[in-house]
Structure formats: structure tokens, C-alpha cells
């Protein structure tokens, strides 16, 4: 097959850039960026990268914490395969020029919810930005890597039952074209923009996951949408809610309700350090009992210099955007969509059920996260699986997953009861508000059946897309329906999925 490149990567986050830098320099590599190279969800990551690095920690402890957070639905073999590469991943990032915070013992490690010890390597509270800056600098030095900005991947091209490239939209001209490749990699992030309140940037419209569904790839665990407990309870900027890092609680931050009472000890023995799903539901429950739509996160009991040193970007943002000095005042917070725990099913090397197609990062479902992601495991997963993927591609290894049985999209008799109550008019804000209500942190059978019926109607009535925005809307609908169907099929409250009727 005549190709335009050896490896075609749709996405420009941490997993995508790690893969490009880990492949042999003899490979012709193309990176498709929907926006700019430096505009990606990875850049907004605050907390850090979890790895068993210190003398008091070991891989078994990290595995145990990950399995507990995943609520029994992790793939333990995948967990061990990925976490065992934590230390080499940190060493690789150091070699790329990432300047992690240090102290007299070496790397300064912080602790976050669900972790039983300090194991989070970080750069203050802007780890993602620091890591991406270092990797972008390395990318620009590689003549074999071609970066194409403002190019949106639309659909997977196949030949003889294997992926052979992508159909692409030039977002500047709205023209479509094809790129043929020996290996195709989807690393376009999650589907956070199906919600009205999310920490993800506007580009996270589920493009890669939607493409995979249309191509018949196996997907899984899409019902497990992680809501971060502490999004800043202020109007969002450019469709993205500002995140108050898990590490604020890891360094002693206390959650209080409208009455000024600390409430987390009533919900879990780990209090503020419980896994995200537990803390998020606890906050939602407290908000439901009070008049204000937020709770307070207070770190002001720590020395002001400590707060400014550990959380400079949070301190700066709250002060400049909200007039809030977190060294003296509590931060108003509420749960916000943050991470897609499921995605395209892969092995730890990123191989999907479609030959020559790989998926990495938040786009993928490796089995590491199970029903709920442990804080700071996602950046680790990006680096480790991308490096393993590079090795698999270079070695020409093959992989075949189990066939994917796509759920029927015909309206059920139960869903039909909403036929007189459905909206014909579609817009992205209407979709996002609808999903926030019915596919949010607290779900029920009636809401999920209504969601499936409404989303199917919108999807059936959708016109053929021609512009970037229209293609994004197609993907948002595809992903929304997949989440709703997966959530309705899950008859067990576990991890990030909670249905009050189960």
C-alpha cells in the first residue's frame, strides 16, 4: 500500500507527543491538531504524575490503591503492566527536560485522594503545562515529525479489514481529504464537551471515540464519567470550568457546607482524601440540602507562603478572576465533569480491535481505571502506553480484541413513552444542558430512558455535516447516546456511575 506516512496520529496531547518522540526517527510521522499544537487538555492538568518512586512506596501499594478506586472493574493485568513502568516514565520525562519540583530527598512528591502515600511527581500546580512545553520543544527538533494544525480527523479509513488512515477536514477551508498511513493512532482526548459544565477545553468533543464507534471498534466503560469534586463555582471561561486541584485536599484542604460544618468524615473514613466519586457525590448531597449551589474548600489554615508556593496558578486565577485570596478565604467549589474513564478498548500497548488502529490517552479504555480513575494515574497512563505503543508499532506486533456488539438503536417500548415529550430542535447548548441533567453525577432510569429516546431522535434528524462545528455536533451526539446506553445497561451502582433506581 502506498502511504503518505508511516504513523498518523490524530491528537496532540501528552500521549500523542510521547508516541511521536518514542518512535524511531526513521519513521515518517504526521500529527493532526484540531487547533494549535499547544492547545490540548493535557496542558491544563494541574496535579501531576503518579508513580511508586519513594522508598516508602512500592508498585504493590500503587496497584492496591488503583484497584480500590476502580471498584473491582480494573483489569489487574493491565494495571500491573502500566504501573510497573511508572518509574521509567518519570525518568523519560526528566530526560525530555521536564523540571519536576524537588526537595532535599530528590523529587518532591505530593499526595492526592485515594492514594495511601505521597507518590505524585509534579511541577507546582501546572504540571501539564510544564510537561507539554518540554515535549513540544522536542517535537520541533525532529525533522521526521510533521505537525498539521487546524486539521480535524473525521473518520477512519479501512482496507482489507484494517485501518489505513483517516479522512480529514481542513478547518481553515472546510475541505476534506484523506491521509493514508501504515499505522493510525487515535489520541484525541475524551468527550467532556457533551456536558454543560466540564474542565475540558472546547476541542474535547469525543471525536476519536465517535469515529471508533462508527468504524465498529470495541468500546467500553463509557458509563463511567468522572466528575471532579472541586470545580471552581464561578462562570466558566470558553466553555471550560477552572479546576481546583485534588492536591489542595492532599495538602490539608478542608470541605465545609453552608453551615460551616466539615462533612466528609460522615461519608468516608478517608474524609477529604477519599476517591473522587465518593467526594463528588458527597458534595452533591450537601448542595441538595442547602440553598447555595456550592460548598467551601479551605486551605487558608496553611501558611500563606506554603499555599502560594504549592498552588501558584490556582492562587493567581482565583485572585485575578474572582477577587479571592485563597491564603485567607475559602474557595467555592462544586462537582464538574472531568474525565472519561472508558473509551476505545485497547491493551496496554494501545492496540484496538481493528488491525493497524491504536488508541491512547483519555480516548482509550486500557482497563487501568475501571469504574473510577485514581487521581494522577491518567498522565502516567499517557506516557506508559504511548511508549509501549511505539515499541509495538516498531516491532510490528499484531493484536485482535473480542468482536464488538453494538447496542441496538431502535426505540424500546419503555423509551417510547416519551415520544410526545421530545424536542425536535437541536443545538449544542441544549444538548449539553440535557446531558448535564440526565447523564450527570446522579442518574435514574426515567432520565436515562428519556435521554436515549431524545438522543436517538436528534441523531436521526441530523443533517449531513460540512463544517467543523457540524462534525463536532455529530460526534457529541454519537458519544452522548453511547454514554446513555451504557449507563442504562449498568444495573449496579459502582465507581463513577450512580443510578438511584438500582
From Swiss-Prot:
UniProt key word Cell inner membrane: no
Enzyme Commission identifier(s): 1.4.3.16
Key word Cytoplasm present: yes
GO MF terms held by the record: L-aspartate oxidase activity; nucleotide binding
Top-level taxon of the source organism: Bacteria
Active site: 276
Reaction catalysis annotation: L-aspartate + O2 = iminosuccinate + H2O2
Binding of FAD, residues: 12-15, 34, 41-48, 207, 362, 378-379
Site positions for Important in orienting the L-aspartate substrate: 112
One of the protein's GO biological processes: 'de novo' NAD biosynthetic process from L-aspartate
Pfam family name, one: FAD_binding_2
Comment on bound cofactor: Binds 1 FAD per subunit.
GO cellular component: cytoplasm
Cofactor field: FAD
Family listed: Belongs to the FAD-dependent oxidoreductase 2 family. NadB subfamily.
Listed name of the protein: L-aspartate oxidase
Organism: Neisseria meningitidis serogroup B (strain ATCC BAA-335 / MC58)
Record lineage: Bacteria, Pseudomonadati, Pseudomonadota, Betaproteobacteria, Neisseriales
Gene name of the record: nadB
Amino acid at each position: 500500500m502506498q502511504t503518505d506516512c508511516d504513523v498518523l496520529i490524530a491528537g496532540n496531547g501528552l500521549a500523542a507527543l510521547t508516541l511521536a518522540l518514542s518512535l524511531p526517527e526513521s519513521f515518517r510521522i504526521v500529527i493532526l491538531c484540531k487547533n494549535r499544537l499547544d492547545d490540548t487538555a493535557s496542558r491544563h492538568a494541574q496535579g501531576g504524575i503518579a508513580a511508586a518512586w519513594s522508598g516508602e512506596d512500592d508498585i504493590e501499594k500503587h496497584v492496591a490503591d488503583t484497584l480500590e478506586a476502580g471498584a473491582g472493574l480494573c483489569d489487574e493485568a493491565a494495571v500491573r503492566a502500566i504501573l510497573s513502568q511508572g518509574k521509567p516514565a518519570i525518568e523519560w520525562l526528566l530526560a525530555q527536560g521536564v523540571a519536576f519540583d524537588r526537595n532535599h530527598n530528590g523529587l518532591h512528591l505530593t499526595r492526592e485522594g485515594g492514594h495511601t502515600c505521597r507518590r505524585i511527581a509534579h511541577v507546582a500546580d501546572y504540571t501539564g503545562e510544564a510537561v507539554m512545553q518540554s515535549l513540544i520543544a522536542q517535537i520541533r527538533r525532529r525533522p521526521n515529525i510533521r505537525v498539521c494544525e487546524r486539521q480535524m480527523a473525521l473518520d477512519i479509513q479501512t482496507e482489507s479489514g484494517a485501518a489505513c488512515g483517516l479522512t480529514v477536514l481542513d478547518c481553515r477551508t472546510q475541505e476534506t481529504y484523506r491521509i493514508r498511513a501504515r499505522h493510525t493512532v487515535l489520541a484525541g482526548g475524551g468527550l467532556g464537551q457533551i456536558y454543560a459544565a466540564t474542565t475540558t477545553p472546547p476541542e474535547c468533543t469525543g471525536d476519536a471515540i465517535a469515529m471508533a464507534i462508527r468504524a465498529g471498534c470495541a468500546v467500553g466503560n463509557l458509563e463511567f464519567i468522572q466528575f471532579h469534586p472541586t470545580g471552581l463555582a464561578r462562570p466558566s471561561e470558553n466553555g471550560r470550568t477552572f479546576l481546583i486541584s485534588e492536591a489542595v485536599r492532599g495538602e490539608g484542604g478542608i470541605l465545609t457546607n453552608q453551615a460551616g460544618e466539615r462533612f466528609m468524615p460522615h461519608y468516608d473514613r478517608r474524609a477529604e482524601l477519599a476517591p473522587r466519586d465518593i467526594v463528588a457525590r458527597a458534595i452533591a448531597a450537601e448542595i441538595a440540602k442547602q440553598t447555595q449551589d456550592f460548598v467551601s474548600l479551605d486551605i487558608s489554615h496553611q501558611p500563606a507562603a506554603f499555599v502560594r508556593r504549592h498552588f501558584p496558578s490556582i492562587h493567581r486565577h482565583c485572585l485575578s478572576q474572582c477577587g479571592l485570596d485563597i491564603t485567607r478565604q475559602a474557595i467555592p467549589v462544586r462537582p464538574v465533569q472531568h474525565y472519561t474513564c472508558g473509551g476505545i478498548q485497547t491493551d496496554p500497548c494501545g492496540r484496538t480491535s481493528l488491525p493497524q488502529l491504536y488508541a491512547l490517552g483519555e480516548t482509550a479504555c486500557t482497563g487501568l481505571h475501571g469504574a473510577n480513575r485514581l487521581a494522577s494515574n491518567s498522565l502516567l497512563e499517557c506516557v506508559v502506553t504511548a511508549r509501549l505503543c511505539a515499541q509495538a508499532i516498531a516491532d510490528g506486533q499484531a493484536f485482535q480484541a473480542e468482536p464488538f456488539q453494538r447496542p441496538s438503536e431502535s426505540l424500546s417500548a419503555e423509551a417510547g413513552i416519551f415520544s410526545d415529550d421530545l424536542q425536535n430542535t437541536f443545538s449544542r447548548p441544549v444538548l449539553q444542558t440535557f446531558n448535564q441533567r440526565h447523564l450527570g453525577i446522579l442518574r435514574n432510569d426515567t432520565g436515562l430512558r428519556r435521554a436515549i429516546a431524545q438522543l436517538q431522535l436528534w441523531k436521526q434528524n441530523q443533517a449531513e455535516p460540512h463544517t467543523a462545528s457540524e462534525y463536532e455536533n455529530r460526534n457529541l451526539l454519537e458519544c452522548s447516546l453511547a454514554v446513555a446506553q451504557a449507563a442504562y445497561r449498568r444495573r449496579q451502582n459502582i465507581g463513577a456511575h450512580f443510578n438511584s433506581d438500582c
